[in-house]
From Swiss-Prot:
<dbReference type="GO" id="GO:0005576">
    <property type="term" value="C:extracellular region"/>
</dbReference>
<keyword id="KW-0611">Plant defense</keyword>
<dbReference type="Pfam" id="PF07333">
    <property type="entry name" value="SLR1-BP"/>
</dbReference>
<feature type="disulfide bond">
    <location>
        <begin position="49"/>
        <end position="73"/>
    </location>
</feature>
<keyword id="KW-0929">Antimicrobial</keyword>
<feature type="disulfide bond">
    <location>
        <begin position="30"/>
        <end position="77"/>
    </location>
</feature>
<dbReference type="GO" id="GO:0031640">
    <property type="term" value="P:killing of cells of another organism"/>
</dbReference>
<protein>
    <recommendedName>
        <fullName>Defensin-like protein 159</fullName>
    </recommendedName>
</protein>
<keyword id="KW-0295">Fungicide</keyword>
<keyword id="KW-1015">Disulfide bond</keyword>
<keyword id="KW-0964">Secreted</keyword>
<feature type="disulfide bond">
    <location>
        <begin position="40"/>
        <end position="59"/>
    </location>
</feature>
<keyword id="KW-0732">Signal</keyword>
<dbReference type="GO" id="GO:0050832">
    <property type="term" value="P:defense response to fungus"/>
</dbReference>
<comment type="similarity">
    <text>Belongs to the DEFL family.</text>
</comment>
<dbReference type="InterPro" id="IPR010851">
    <property type="entry name" value="DEFL"/>
</dbReference>
<feature type="disulfide bond">
    <location>
        <begin position="45"/>
        <end position="71"/>
    </location>
</feature>
C-alpha cells in the first residue's frame, strides 16, 4: 500500500510541475504603438511588427493621438 501511495504522489508532483511549466511558457502580452506620425498601412504594419518584435501588427484608431489610424504591435514580452 505504501508503494502505491508513493507512486500516486510522484505522478501528482509530475503533473503539477508540468502545469507550472506551461504557465511560464505562455508569457505576457505587450502592446506598442509604432510610428504615430504616419497613417497605418496594414501590410507595412504587420511586416514591421513581425520583423522588429516577432508579433502581430494591426491598424487601430487611438483617441489619445490625433490624426490617422496608428499601427499597433502585440507581442510576447
Amino acid at each position: 500500500m505504501a508503494k502505491l501511495s508513493c507512486s500516486y504522489f510522484l505522478v501528482l508532483i509530475l503533473v503539477f510541475s508540468a502545469f507550472l511549466m506551461v504557465e511560464r511558457a505562455e508569457g505576457k502580452r505587450c502592446h506598442l504603438t509604432i510610428d504615430k506620425a504616419t497613417a497605418c498601412s496594414l501590410s507595412d504594419c504587420r511586416l514591421s511588427c513581425y520583423s522588429g518584435y516577432n508579433g502581430v501588427g494591426k491598424c487601430f484608431d487611438d483617441p489619445k493621438v490625433a490624426g490617422p489610424s496608428n499601427c499597433g504591435c502585440i507581442y510576447n514580452c
